[in-house]
């Protein structure tokens, strides 16, 4: 696609008064500095923006409003910003329907008519009559209260659902009579990082922490998770503590009742990797039996059959395996393979009385169906090369559902018959997008240490490799999370306007199992950044794009990725989008759930060596005066209680204070929003319109054609 070019220097000069020190630098809102230092192993580290950690303080609120105005004033000058927003609204406006699930005498599914702030949960009876069951759009005036989870009892007569207000991780649990939809008068408050698991009709298990003191709810550290049982008809203050707290201090604890209602399973962990597993036989009223203790591996109960327990684990199997044991002696030495480890990472789902094994080869899914003895029933033929998710359901169900997607295929839901192996389209979205006009190719490139890395590159057919294609390079690189092909209407608009969307599967993720993850953690974390840098260099060397047309993008741990990359290699790209990022690596573990991320990062208190390593790449601590950084939009939310906004506030302030060239440094702060989940459609569209228009504008593009 052709673009008209614009001198961004002229636009930037016209936009704001210039600094007396450097006529190329924008005049940013004033951010005060304080005299504060911390000492680590004898080394003093200055923290001049420490005051921004108090996100409820009046001076912080005033600073936020100044930055919001500055950012919006800058974005308002982009001539095609509204045009891109209209394009996004237009393509977003299609009916989205989830896979159905059965509970009691009803079939439930969620649907969004197109531009609704939140999807609505519907149900259909045996006669085919459909009605609204839960409409989150009525939870709040602005559509920013979302449905976080829904859990029915076994008979489908009772339901407990949790809601998140403003994207917060602190939820409420509301209980309904599913038949009448009448709300029970016993709402549970201050619930965090919790499932909801029913025990018959008596009540349910849930998890939470002691809530931080008033004024630090969004930033205070949460520790010592607790599992409670709420008995219907009683007050929350009467809920029974099952496990956790001072007598069993663990950072994360989850409890659930198995499908046969016989066992209570408890998973406990101190970090995001590695867990202990305990099980209680409710039928025989045993105490908790330890299946595995310590945090050296991951294990969970995949299914049960009488006394037999099926466990899914990476113990002695970095790519994971399915094993079986018995309740009488579930220790690891008794485990027997049902589905053995292979060279590809494995995930397991159960439904229809079968196991469905999803193998990931170079970030692409392959699915196989096995019986309970581990005998292969069939390899399932998928509609193409991409990501298949689903295949879960009750043991008695013969029809299961799965969703298939890739970067140029909108997610389509298929109904799968476990007996015949036939798949048929259940729901295909009517998106204004023709996959036939686009290409999604996988390439492999070499990182700085010789490691081979896969990357998916998607774009519109007819693209010329002349180095002038606007390109978003996006990745994550952490916490064993795999980036698999998935369609996005935002990326569709980007590609429709001539852009390239590239996703490298860098180390730190789970694309090649535990070893791949571990190769991007702690003292090897820089492998992640080097992999990302090498991806950008590959795209530039092979003519897909050039520095002047490349944008770096990532969120959360991916925000760290972008922040570290742009401070290590400020010359790599024209634009950078560190979104809701972990950016102060010396203090991340002091806030909310941050201490649980230490498996990936290590902490500044671990050792002198670990402190020095973290400091050497921590984005907040590596912004250097006199350096020209990319045009940057630091993205955060003022109510983010997962990765607190202080990370972004500090990093953005450092960049604004030390930027040495005309490239703008914006801090886009979403007000009354959290880490990302549960935002309204309007909020998501607005952010992405800002992101895409800023990228193109900073690449020197004047208008779209």
Swiss-Prot record:
It is found in: Periplasm. Its EC number is 3.4.21.26. GO terms for biological process: proteolysis. Keywords: Hydrolase, Periplasm, Protease, Serine protease, Signal. GO terms for cellular component: cytosol; periplasmic space. Residues 1-20 form the signal peptide. Gene3D superfamilies: alpha/beta hydrolase (3.40.50.1820), Prolyl oligopeptidase, N-terminal domain (2.130.10.120). Pfam families: Peptidase_S9 (PF00326), Peptidase_S9_N (PF02897). GO terms for molecular function: oligopeptidase activity; serine-type endopeptidase activity. Its main location: periplasm. It catalyses: Hydrolysis of Pro-|-Xaa >> Ala-|-Xaa in oligopeptides. The active site is at 556 (charge relay system), 675 (charge relay system). Cleaves peptide bonds on the C-terminal side of prolyl residues within peptides that are up to approximately 30 amino acids long. Has an absolute requirement for an X-Pro bond in the trans configuration immediately preceding the Pro-Y scissible bond. Monomer. Belongs to the peptidase S9A family. This is Prolyl endopeptidase. It comes from Elizabethkingia meningoseptica. The lineage of its organism: Bacteria, Pseudomonadati, Bacteroidota, Flavobacteriia, Flavobacteriales.
């Amino acid at each position: 696609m052709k673009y008209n070019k614009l001198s961004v220097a002229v636009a930037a000069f016209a936009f704001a008064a210039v600094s007396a020190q450097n006529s190329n630098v924008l005049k940013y809102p004033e951010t005060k500095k304080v005299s504060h230092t911390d000492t680590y192993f004898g080394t003093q580290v200055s923290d001049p923006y420490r005051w921004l950690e108090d996100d409820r303080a009046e001076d912080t609120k005033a600073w936020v409003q100044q930055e919001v105005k500055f950012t919006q004033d800058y974005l308002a000058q982009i001539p095609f910003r509204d045009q891109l927003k209209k394009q996004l609204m237009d393509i977003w406006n299609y009916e989205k329907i989830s896979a159905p699930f059965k509970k009691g005498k009803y079939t439930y599914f969620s649907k969004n008519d197109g531009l609704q702030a939140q999807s609505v949960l519907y149900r259909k009876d045996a006669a085919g009559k459909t009605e609204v069951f839960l409409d989150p759009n009525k939870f709040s005036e602005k559509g920013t209260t979302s449905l976080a989870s829904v859990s029915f009892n076994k008979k489908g007569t009772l339901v407990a659902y949790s809601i998140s207000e403003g994207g917060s991780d602190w939820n409420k649990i509301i209980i309904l009579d599913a038949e009448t939809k009448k709300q029970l008068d016993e709402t549970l408050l201050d619930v965090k990082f919790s499932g909801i698991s029913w025990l018959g009709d008596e009540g349910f298990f849930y998890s939470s922490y002691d809530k931080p003191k008033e004024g630090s709810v969004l930033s205070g550290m949460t520790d010592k998770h607790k599992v409670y049982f709420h008995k219907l008809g009683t007050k929350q203050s009467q809920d029974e503590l099952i496990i956790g707290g001072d007598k069993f201090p663990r950072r994360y604890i989850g409890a659930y009742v198995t499908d046969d209602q016989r066992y209570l399973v408890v998973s406990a962990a101190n970090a995001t990797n590695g867990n202990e597993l305990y099980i209680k036989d409710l039928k025989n009223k045993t105490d908790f039996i330890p299946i595995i203790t310590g945090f050296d591996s991951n294990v969970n109960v995949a299914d049960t059959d009488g006394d037999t327990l099926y466990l899914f684990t990476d113990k002695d199997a970095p790519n994971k395996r399915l094993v079986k044991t018995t309740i009488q002696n579930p220790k690891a030495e008794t485990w027997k393979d049902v589905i053995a480890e292979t060279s590809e990472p494995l995930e397991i789902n159960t439904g229809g009385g079968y196991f469905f094994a999803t193998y990931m080869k170079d970030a692409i899914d392959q699915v196989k169906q096995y019986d309970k003895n581990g005998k292969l029933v069939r390899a399932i033929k998928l509609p193409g090369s991409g990501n298949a998710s689903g295949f879960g359901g009750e043991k008695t169900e013969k029809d299961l559902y799965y969703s298939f997607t890739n970067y140029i295929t909108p997610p389509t839901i298929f109904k799968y018959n476990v007996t015949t192996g036939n798949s048929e389209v259940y729901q295909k979205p009517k998106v204004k997008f023709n996959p036939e006009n686009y290409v999604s190719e996988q390439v492999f490139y070499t990182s700085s240490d010789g490691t081979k890395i896969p990357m998916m590159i998607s774009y519109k057919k007819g693209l010329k490799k002349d180095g002038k294609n606007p390109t978003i390079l996006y990745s994550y690189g952490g916490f064993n999370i795999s980036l698999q092909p998935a369609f996005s209407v935002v990326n569709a608009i980007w590609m429709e306007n001539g852009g390239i969307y590239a996703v490298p599967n860098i180390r730190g993720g789970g694309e090649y199992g535990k070893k791949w993850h571990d190769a991007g953690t702690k003292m090897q974390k820089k492998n992640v950044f080097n992999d990302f840098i090498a991806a950008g260099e590959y795209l530039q060397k092979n003519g897909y794009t050039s520095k002047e047309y490349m944008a770096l993008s990532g969120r959360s741990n991916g925000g760290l990725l972008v922040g570290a990359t742009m401070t290590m290699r400020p010359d790599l790209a024209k634009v950078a989008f560190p979104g809701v990022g972990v950016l102060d690596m010396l203090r991340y573990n002091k806030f909310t759930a941050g201490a649980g991320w230490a498996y990936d990062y290590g902490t500044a208190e671990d050792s002198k060596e670990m402190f020095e390593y973290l400091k050497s790449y921590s984005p907040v601590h590596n912004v250097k005066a006199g350096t020209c950084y990319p045009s940057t939009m630091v993205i955060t939310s003022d109510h983010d209680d997962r990765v607190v906004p202080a990370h972004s506030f500090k990093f953005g302030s450092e960049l604004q204070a030390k930027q040495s060239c005309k490239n703008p440094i914006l801090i886009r702060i979403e007000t009354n929003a959290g880490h990302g989940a549960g935002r309204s459609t309007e909020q998501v569209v607005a952010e992405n319109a800002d992101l895409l228009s800023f990228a193109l504008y900073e690449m020197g593009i004047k208008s779209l054609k």
